Amino acid sequence: THRLMIGVDIMKDFGASPVSPERAPEGSAETDRRLSNLNLFRELTLYYSLDRQMGKTGLSVTAGIFPRRMAEGNYSRAFFSDSLRFYDNNLEGLLVKVSRPKANFEIGCDWMGQYGTFRRERFMIFSSGEGKVASMLSLGYSAYLYHYSCSETAGGVVDNVLINPYLKFDFAHMVDFQILSLRL
């Protein structure tokens, strides 16, 4: 299945609206007109998606600016903070997912900043996978590389690598629950 999607990302912080200039001191951030409901549109979403089933193997490829929720890997909060998930809820890049009856894997790239005079080059390559090796046991991992590079005015490069392998014991079938598992 081929899809071409276009939309807009709308965001409103509950309770965030401008205060009347008569009620706040001059220069207060709370009087900023950008807090009004006229400035809800944050980002254009535009992406191409391909979903294909080849025997028992499913393949999904998404490219463009698309919702972060499309990345379905089992990532710790150490990888993606709540504020990143909420305030930067779109990925700008590529996501490839492969699924089998007893395993699933994904790899993606989020391009967060293009090199410029004052803007640093930033991107994140992330991956997650899990495979069932026995009825109660799965092996999995999540990993990322975060690249934070220089700009024309600031030098230096930082590359952070985070890898989280795990064992997962699934007890749900023993007690008739949808989910009951232990990750080590």
What function would you assign to each model-found segment?
Residues S60-E130, L145-H147:
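Surface-exposed coil loops of outer-membrane beta-barrel proteins
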Residues A29-L35, F79-D82, W111-Y115, S151-G155:
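Extracellular loop and loop/strand-boundary signature of outer-membrane beta-barrel proteins
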Residues H2-L4, Q53-G58, K102, E130-G140, ...:
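Short loop/turn motifs that connect adjacent beta-strands in outer-membrane beta-barrel proteins
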Residues T1-M54:
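Beta-barrel outer-membrane channel/assembly domains of diderm bacteria
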